[in-house]
Regions:
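Active-site-adjacent betaalpha module
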Residues: 1-29, 38, 43, 72-77, ...
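A short alpha/beta connector and helix-capping loop motif
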Residues: 26, 42-74, 79-81
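Short hydrophobic beta-strand that contains or immediately precedes a catalytic carboxylate
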Residues: 31-33
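Intrinsic disorder/low-structure terminal segments
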Residues: 54-55, 82, 162, 219
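A basic- and aromatic-enriched beta-loop-alpha substructure that forms the phosphate/nucleotide-
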Residues: 82, 86-88
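A substrate-binding/cap region within the structured catalytic cores of diverse enzymes
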Residues: 96
Length: 222
């Protein structure tokens, strides 16, 4: 099955196949979301370790290598490469959004200069590639990314990163609402559970973005 027929939600099961996608390099940007050291730290607790093992396996064997390949290809094809990472400006995190202050897994206190807030070594930015710091789920909310994309005449955004059902989904929806054409690269994304990853891609596909594989996405770029 191709991207034209995969990840069909209830609402789009009978919809016609979309037209072929052509991404002109000068009008396209790649946005890599939140692939940070924090999320590659293996939990000390044995139960949590076991619970998160499938996620770490997918990240190490699929998502990070594929994202590195996608970045390399975009650089070669003169597609603008951008990054978003969760990082607060204040050491005590007072500038964070409420969603990152609430107790639980989503409580995040990562000042911008800490090691855990940095992008993983396999996908570090080069030269003047843009990195936006956010304390929100969406990479557009609370950053200048929307204005940056507009100023650079970007119309198409390729999205990779984590977590599919959280920051990736929020960013994809924001981009769609701002009238960008969005491609979510399935095998460059992950969620805590693969079931959550698959379901969220089904939910956002064809309304907020088109979901495609790495190989398909590369073939779209002209």
């Amino acid at each position: 099955m191709s991207w034209k027929t995969m990840y069909r939600s209830f609402y789009y099961q009978g919809a016609p196949e979309p037209e072929d996608i052509v991404l002109n390099a000068e009008e396209t940007a790649l946005l890599v979301i939140d692939i940070q050291n924090k999320y590659m730290d293996v939990p000390d607790d044995p139960d949590e370790n076991r619970r998160w093992t499938p996620f770490f396996e997918r990240m190490n064997s699929i998502v990070i290598p594929n994202t590195a390949r996608l970045i390399k290809t975009c650089r070669q094809k003169n597609v603008e490469v951008m990054f978003a990472r969760i990082a607060c400006l204040k050491e005590d995190g007072r500038d964070r959004s409420l969603s990152q202050k609430k107790p639980g897994w989503n409580y995040l206190l990562m000042p911008q200069n800490t090691e855990e807030s940095q992008l993983v070594p396999e996908i570090v930015p080069q030269n003047d590639e843009i990195v936006v710091c956010k304390t929100t789920d969406s990479a557009l909310t609370g950053t200048s990314l929307r204005l940056i994309l507009s100023n650079m005449a970007v119309k198409n955004v390729i999205v990779a990163g984590i977590f599919t059902d959280q920051c990736v989904s929020s960013t994809v929806r924001s981009l769609a609402d701002e009238s960008f054409n969005v491609i979510a690269v399935e095998d460059c994304c992950a969620a805590g559970l693969h079931e959550l990853h698959e379901k969220e891609l089904e939910i956002i596909n064809m309304i907020y973005c088109h979901v495609a594989s790495l190989a398909e996405t590369i073939s779209f770029i002209r």
